[in-house]
Amino acid sequence: MSTDLYGWLECRPEPGRFGAEHVPWEPFSELRHLHWARDYMSWSALFDVRSVEPVNALFPDRGAPADISDTARRDADDFEGHSHSWFSWRELSSVDWNAPCTDGLSRYWVRRWSRTPEGSLEPEGLTALPDELYDSAAAEFGEGNIAPSRWPADGKLLLGNEVYRPVTPAYRDLVPADGPWQPVFDVMGTLAGLHGEDNVRLVVWFGG
């Protein structure tokens, strides 16, 4: 069964900017206008949704903000969703994207390295272990050690011109800077420059 992501980007003027100390949040854009991909890999790192293994998610299941905008609240209430959460631009901009998001080697992901025409290896993105390598993993590391987390840290398997190695994934591996979240983060950063880092946030929930 597939899962879908819903939500609203919200902002508010800097409190006190127009004389009012309490400024309500306003809906800026429905998330679907900026992000529509079923990107389970990034959802696991951000919200611990559709995770294939234990991940130290950044903003898991925080619930909807108490002061959510009326428009976003109506949408969230009308939809029987789950895993409601949110994050501000300040929180997002303080993330160490190079930090590991799992406790040790991933039991699911491996790093794929491709051989260049010159013969050197260049790292590519993360991928699940190809089915063709299951037998090779059993032969190389033992029948009970097919999961990459059970390989030696320097273990590797070859498939054609590609090499697969175990990896402790970083948040940036699961949420690439040029991935589906780029438009969302770009807009949030622009709004934060205008209204302040604490006055821009994304509210999300999931269906399915």
Q: PLM features: residue spans?
A:
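Acidic (Asp/Glu-rich) sequence patches and key acidic residues
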Residues: 1-196, 207-208
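C-terminal interaction-tip segments
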Residues: 198-203
